[in-house]
Curated annotation (Swiss-Prot):
Belongs to the LpxB family. It comes from Escherichia coli O1:K1 / APEC. This is Lipid-A-disaccharide synthase. Keywords: Glycosyltransferase, Lipid A biosynthesis, Lipid biosynthesis, Lipid metabolism, Transferase. Pathway: Glycolipid biosynthesis; lipid IV(A) biosynthesis; lipid IV(A) from (3R)-3-hydroxytetradecanoyl-[acyl-carrier-protein] and UDP-N-acetyl-alpha-D-glucosamine: step 5/6. InterPro entries: Glyco_trans_19. One of its GO terms (biological process) is lipid A biosynthetic process. The lineage of its organism: Bacteria, Pseudomonadati, Pseudomonadota, Gammaproteobacteria, Enterobacterales. It holds the Pfam family LpxB. One of its GO terms (cellular component) is membrane. It catalyses: 2-N,3-O-bis[(3R)-3-hydroxytetradecanoyl]-alpha-D-glucosaminyl 1-phosphate + UDP-2-N,3-O-bis[(3R)-3-hydroxytetradecanoyl]-alpha-D-glucosamine = lipid A disaccharide (E. coli) + UDP + H(+); a lipid X + a UDP-2-N,3-O-bis[(3R)-3-hydroxyacyl]-alpha-D-glucosamine = a lipid A disaccharide + UDP + H(+).
Length: 382
């Protein structure tokens, strides 16, 4: 009599954010099925949870076209090898975590071999290159989506999708401790405080920092006690920001922070930020915000033709209306940015209404995503 094989889940994560999601999923699955086996491409967090790494996650974590081209042969070799080895292993379910350019083709290859496939984290198909939805539909048995409007998009195309809530919404409290964050950053409780977040990429910091600093100078005229906090993701971005500040606003006193973006948001009365995940995090920190963004004119021209949504920031996409002010391209200039931020720093009716809506949206996407994802995997495995 042969011993029954344990539940076997294959996973591929391609970057740190995927490693965090994968570790949370493995943890939730082990609580339900303690003897389950996990194999695939994993980072340190997934490996710490017991995932057997056939390849290290760093192998897939390449950014930019030039870097990808330089590594293309290796990436194609890894994908072909995984197709073969997973095909032989026949896991109960394959979970591709983000990394859509690598994972969706792999999912399609495995599905053809009769393996059930899940794509965890929807690519932004609802915003641009919408035809990708058909490839995703052919390659996967189920998409796990963080946001409710993503599920609505897949439903329109009859692609099975489950809204599981957002892990960031699970990790952040509904009512953040503003005074606690100010203690950490050394900001007086009674001061007005503004967070500047000019982005995590070099091009964004280059394009936005000068206008963000000039905006802060204008606001300081109205609020002389204004404390300005600037969290920067790494030493390179800090150096870049300091260079721009020396040229544009050498006398403006600011608190430069290494990381600590979340603390800066929680501590602040308002934030001026580039779009992206930071806007969602800022919403969850209950910090009223203005989104300012600029890109090269040709890139913007192209984006306007490709992007199919009315808004660029996640709070507005979640609310289905302009909840936070978005000032893009030529609109992203100090006078307009300052005018949009002034009522938020006043901490009056506008701020309180925004705060209340942020809290409602937080509750909508706070669904214990790790548990929901684990449940979806087990249901598909049956």
């Amino acid at each position: 009599m042969t011993e029954q094989r344990p539940l076997t889940i294959a996973l591929v994560a391609g970057e740190t954010s995927g490693d965090i999601l994968g570790a949370g999923l493995i943890r939730a699955l082990k609580e339900r099925v303690p003897n389950a086996r996990f194999v695939g491409v994993a980072g340190p967090r997934m490996q710490a949870e017991g995932c057997e790494a056939w390849y290290e996650m760093e192998e897939l974590a390449v950014m930019g076209i030039v870097e990808v081209l330089g590594r293309l042969r290796r990436l194609l070799h890894i994908r072909a090898d995984l197709t073969k080895r997973f095909g032989e292993l026949k896991p109960d379910v394959f979970v591709g975590i983000d990394a859509p350019d690598f994972n969706i083709t792999l999912e399609g290859n495995l599905k053809k071999q009769g393996i059930k496939t899940i794509h965890y984290v929807s690519p932004s198909v609802w915003a641009w290159r919408q035809k990708r939805v058909f490839k995703i539909g052919r390659a996967t048995d189920l998409v796990l989506a963080f946001l409710p409007f993503e599920k609505a998009f897949y439903d329109k195309y009859n692609v099975p999708c489950r809204f599981i809530g957002h892990t960031m919404a699970d990790a952040m409290p509904l009512d953040p401790d503003k005074n606690g964050a100010r203690d950490v950053l050394g900001i007086p409780y009674d001061a007005h405080c503004l967070a500047l977040l000019p982005g995590s990429r070099g091009a964004e910091v280059e394009m936005l920092s000068a206008d963000f600093l000039k905006t802060a100078q204008l606001l300081r005229q109205t609020y002389p006690d204004l404390e300005i906090v600037v969290p920067l993701v790494n030493a390179k971005r800090r150096e870049q920001f300091e260079r721009i500040k020396a040229a544009v606003a050498p006398d403006l006193s600011v608190h430069l922070l290494d990381g600590m973006g979340r603390e800066a948001m929680v501590a602040s009365d308002a934030a001026l930020l580039a779009s992206g995940t930071a806007a969602l995090e800022c919403m969850l920190a209950k910090c009223p915000m203005v989104v300012g963004y600029r890109m090269k004119p040709f890139t913007f021209w192209l984006a306007k033709r490709l992007v199919k949504t009315d808004y660029v920031s996640l709070p507005n996409l979640l609310a289905g209306r302009e909840l936070v002010k978005e000032l893009l391209q030529e609109e992203c200039e100090p006078q307009k940015l300052a005018a949009a931020l002034l009522p938020l720093l006043a901490n009056g009716k506008t701020s309180h209404a925004m705060h209340d809506t942020f809290r409602e949206l937080h509750q909508q996407i706070r669904c214990n995503a790790d548990e929901q994802a684990a449940q979806a995997v087990l249901e598909l495995a049956q």
